Amino acid sequence: MFRIVNGEDYSPAVQQRNILDFGKAPSLLWTDNGSSNDRCETGGNCRESGQDRVKRPMNAFIVWSRDQRRKVALENPQMQNSEISKRLGYDWKMLTEAEKQPFFEEAQRLRAMHRDKYPGYKYRPRRKAKEATEIASRRLFSTVQPNAHRGDLVPLHIQGRLRQGHTFTNGKPVKPLAAHEHKQLTPATGASQQLDKPAPQ
């Protein structure tokens, strides 16, 4: 399962041989096996979800770019994968509709096979880690804010500024407080107390 990696594994000759062999031998990346348990889609260890995940069928660009990527990599062994991807995107845009047509037909055939093999399939993209973190922080914020009452003090870093001293909380405008209405949270109790009390009249 594991092997020791040495510097020779990254030599141009070995990389070129790997590129040539890519796609010839069955690999998890291109496998059509639905029981590959998610490894082909995430590159992870498949135990994250209790169910088998199914790869999406390839679209026309992916069908075309599979062979093209190999050719470009062989012609330009020093080119980075990101540069190859940019070049392939540009080359695909430059193809005429007639040149693209066989790849659209192949993609349609693959889609039909996929539909027959997985009739109940529905594409469910995974959330990226950053996106999931933002959603979690929004949920936390939304659970804290509804508990605030109109008279409670909202921390300044949460308030947004409108024009001429008006503020808003949760998208609703709030009138600025008069000098005698300012409140402060005391550190010990968290209770609010008046700072500037109006003089008794």
From Swiss-Prot:
Compartments, as annotated in UniProt: Nucleus speckle; Cytoplasm; Nucleus
Post-translational modification: Acetylation of Lys-130 contributes to its nuclear localization and enhances its interaction with KPNB1. Deacetylated by HDAC3.
DNA-binding region, residue range(s): 54-122
PROSITE patterns tied to this protein: HMG_BOX_2 (PS50118)
Region (Disordered): 166-201
Any GO BP: male sex determination
Biased composition (Polar residues): 186-195
GO MF annotation, one: DNA-binding transcription activator activity, RNA polymerase II-specific
Keywords annotated in UniProt: Acetylation, Activator, Calmodulin-binding, Cytoplasm, Differentiation, DNA-binding, Nucleus, Repressor, Sexual differentiation, Transcription, Transcription regulation
One GO location term (cellular component): nucleus
Matches recorded under InterPro entries: HMG_box_dom, HMG_box_dom_sf, SRY, SRY-related_HMG-box_TF-like
Superkingdom per UniProt: Eukaryota
PANTHER family on file: SEX-DETERMINING REGION Y PROTEIN, SOX TRANSCRIPTION FACTOR
Function: Transcriptional regulator that controls a genetic switch in male development. It is necessary and sufficient for initiating male sex determination by directing the development of supporting cell precursors (pre-Sertoli cells) as Sertoli rather than granulosa cells. Involved in different aspects of gene regulation including promoter activation or repression. Binds to the DNA consensus sequence 5'-[AT]AACAA[AT]-3'. SRY HMG box recognizes DNA by partial intercalation in the minor groove and promotes DNA bending. Also involved in pre-mRNA splicing.
Assigned protein family: Belongs to the SRY family.
Subunit structure: Interacts with CALM, EP300, HDAC3, KPNB1, ZNF208 isoform KRAB-O, PARP1, SLC9A3R2 and WT1. The interaction with EP300 modulates its DNA-binding activity. The interaction with KPNB1 is sensitive to dissociation by Ran in the GTP-bound form. Interaction with PARP1 impaired its DNA-binding activity.
Name of the molecule in the record: Sex-determining region Y protein
High-level lineage: Eukaryota, Metazoa, Chordata, Craniata, Vertebrata
